[in-house]
């Protein structure tokens, strides 16, 4: 949250500034204290120039609950595009092409089973084998920092970029941790323990939809990932998930566990069911470009009821 640094006295000494750690000003993850610059740093240089932080425009948009379509950069752009066209103004609406998506081999096939199609009408996934998890390129890190997100690694950053760019939450699993080589979308017995990414062990409700492997749960569907199934610096193969989860199921689960995430915020308002495959293909292409590897399976696409485009 932004605040103004004001002149104050500390132990009788007037202070005109504040000591900030790297993580407090969005240039790194270290919280040790004073940032020590090398002697080559030129006094008077703007911090944004020294750290190569690109300037950009940031728009704050208040979204009413019925405008889930505007919960992304593309959604807002689409709204502006419609307004401009209606008023006779020249405008173009563009998004990245995914025509280059192609399966390189079938070396890592992970099966998908959806046991609860009411809670999950559409689930899709694909594997990318031989990735190198590392820092994202500067342009991607800047895109995330500008909107207040902390870069983590190239694979996770891609999923965060896509959810904010196009409104479709994605999840990335370490493929080696999908026991039995199968992803199963289902509910589990009341009281089943599950530890989420924040290290908290939660007791599941019988109506919490879960993403599981053959032996254990891996993720609370549409809400929060598990502590042990996500990608890390040692991950070599990933399984990318893109899905449409029913808004009511996500909303109730998020409330039960006191969770409010970027994913649940969008799913409980209703994401575009026609964006599922597009965003999955875009994520796979970006992973290939930024983390290497090969697309090593067909897209596993389980769709109970294909959605149709709305006509206005």
List where the protein language model places each region.
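RNA/tRNA-interacting regions in translation and RNA-turnover enzymes
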Residues: 1-312
């Amino acid at each position: 949250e932004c605040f103004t640094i004001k002149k104050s006295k500390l132990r009788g000494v007037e202070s005109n500034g504040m000591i900030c750690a790297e993580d407090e000003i969005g240039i790194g993850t270290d919280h040790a204290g004073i940032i020590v610059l090398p002697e080559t740093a030129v006094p008077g240089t703007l911090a944004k120039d020294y750290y190569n932080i690109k300037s950009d425009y940031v728009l704050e948009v208040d979204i009413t609950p019925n405008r889930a379509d505007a919960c992304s950069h593309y959604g807002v752009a689409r709204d502006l595009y419609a307004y401009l066209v209606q008023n006779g103004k020249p405008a173009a609406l563009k998004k990245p092409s995914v025509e280059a998506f192609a399966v390189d081999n079938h070396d890592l096939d992970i099966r998908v089973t959806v046991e609860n199609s009411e809670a999950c009408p559409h689930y899709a996934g694909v594997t990318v084998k031989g990735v190198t998890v590392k820092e994202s390129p500067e342009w991607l890190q800047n895109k995330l920092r500008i909107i207040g997100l902390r870069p983590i690694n190239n694979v996770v950053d891609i999923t965060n970029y896509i959810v904010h760019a196009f409104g479709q939450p994605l999840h990335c699993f370490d493929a080696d941790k999908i026991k039995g080589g199968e992803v199963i979308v289902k509910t589990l017995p009341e009281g089943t323990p599950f530890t989420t990414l924040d290290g908290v062990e939660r007791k599941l409700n019988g109506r919490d939809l879960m993403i599981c492997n053959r032996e254990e749960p891996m993720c609370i569907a549409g809400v929060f990932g598990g502590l042990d199934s996500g990608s890390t610096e040692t991950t070599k193969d990933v399984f990318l998930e893109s899905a449409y989860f029913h808004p009511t199921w996500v909303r109730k689960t998020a409330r039960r566990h006191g969770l409010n995430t970027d994913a649940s915020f969008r799913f409980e308002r209703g994401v575009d069911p026609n964006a599922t495959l597009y965003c999955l293909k875009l994520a796979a292409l970006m992973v290939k470009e930024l983390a290497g590897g090969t697309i090593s399976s067909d897209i596993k696409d389980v769709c109970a009821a294909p959605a149709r485009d709305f006509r206005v």
